[in-house]
Amino acid sequence: MPRVLVANRGEIAIRVFRAAVELGWNTVALFTENDSSHATYADERIQLDGPLDYMNVQKIVECAINSKATHLHPGYGYLSESPELASACFSDNIVFIGPSPETLRIASDKMRSRELAISLNVPVAAGKRVNSAEDVIELARGVQFPVMIKALDGGGGRGIRICESENEVGEAFKRCLGESPSRQLFAEKALKGPGWKHVEIQIVGDGHEVVHLWERECSVQRRFQKIVETAPSSLPRSSVQPLIDSAMKMAAALQYRSLGTFEFMVNATTENWVFLEINPRVQVEHTVTEEITNTDLVQAQLKLSLPSNTLSSLSLSSKQMLPTGYAVQLRLTAEDPAKAFQLSPGAIRPEDIAWPAGRGIRIDTWLSSLEGQLFTVGTDFDSLLAKVIVHGASFEEATQKAKRALKELRLNANVQTNAAVLHGLLEHPDWSSGGIDTLWLERNLDSVLGLGKPATSNFQTGVASAVPTSTTSSASSYVTLQPGTIFHLNLFSNEKPSDTSTSHTMTLSSIALNTFPERLSGTLQTSFSGLGVVNFDLSQSTSSASTAALELADPNNPSHVGSPLTGKVVELHSALSGSDGGGRIRKGETIAVLSVMKMESVVSAPRDGWVARVPKGVKVGVVVGEGTLLAVFEDRSRL
């Protein structure tokens, strides 16, 4: 019996486990200490040392060998497009569920896949590999700004920046380099005009024959991250057919095996189109293709990894899988639209969630466990909470079903979401008319939020209960915390037993860092009888020394520079390298770089000044919360 190890986490791991179990396969999960909900769906579980192990080829293969896995499914992201992982599996007689290493060396490399397209007369945007900011500027002088810098191995919006002028190139190049695992980049002419839609073709191959499973449209994006996907596309068939033909031609040239997606940009006005890239793996949005073709794509992947199976034997052909109806996928993320879509970390209890249900509604999420546990949203992984997938006989029916699904969805936790954006999008007239391009959301965000907020006024009604219902020793881990939460506690003397207690009130007045129950620091405002109001610094006893040493910035103190978001410090200005400060920083200089969900955000100096002090906890590798004090400035010109 096949035994598959899934080298991934979250909803995609659960998706693969479910598909494998239905085929009678044994399953093995990898998990980390504070992220294990997906592992409850597997037969065997292996704990990793930390999130970085998901990117460690040697560690992943070692886990597969030790668990006696016959197959390895990489999911999406992480090492899913790694020819090194595929080769290592082959060397150790483990079946890699995906394309061959030879195919991956071309398909996962954006430059080599462009070269393949060019050799087959498939149009691409002007571009080249770049090793420096100067290379980008040289390209721009030939094709004119704007240009786009991309990581060769980027994805999910990571490793991508648009430059409108020369003075933006240096910082953009540096950030893309930091977000690229291979630290390899290329640049191309950016397609920023109105009307450009993102359309992708789903193919599946057995190494000899290739078929397509129609197209998906992914034009609803923000900062190159897909938010909503539909199938089929809103474009006329005459605009889609050349994309299908090109995808089939390229896949055939690669002798493609397993699932693959070929991405294109199409201008709905001019009908111009170009090839973008190949995603040689299962996509986040594979669900909408499954809905319109009534095909389990993940099971198809698993079956095609067995040498006896072919497309023909599995009855997989485009003629047999004609699209039926329309499907929409809405990505619910832990991002706060009111704060420029910053990650909203926090804890979610199972009882805080209510998912929509009914015919034609499907939920793929990691906020699900066979054992019941606290879910923690942190900075180590992406912000995706759930995928809400609907299917209807028509586009209008699918839209109405999506509206109902969002209306029924409840998340009563301190984690903010993009629900208002999803609601507002479906209410906007451009959604119904098909008038959405890849920059539409950025142009129309205010109106989208205006339409969406009334529909989500009751979406997050706050903490269901500040007091845990359980009285066991582990109950404290089920307390959901946010500023303003009031605790009613009974305090007993440690000196002698007592049958009486005095009631006091404690209010969590501010939070420096909250990825509770993993870490928490902030300020408690406490009212004691006869003593008035007393403020206490709050930190978990299990916190690291560096976390406990973090401080909150005072927004009213002009000398304080606070973190605008929650993230891991990956770079600090040399002037912040010591707690005593002393270095000079000019306005606009980068004082810190924070990594959030593998994307880097720059914190710039708001003014000229000298660093007078740096909190002891601020150092590379530490997770800081929104509002955490990064440095104290002083203006020596006044001395």
Mark where each language-model region is.
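Conserved N-proximal alpha/beta basic substrate-recognition cap immediately N-terminal to
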Residues: 8, 51-122
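Short acidic loop-to-helix transition motifs that present clustered carboxylates
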Residues: 129-136, 168, 192-195, 568, ...
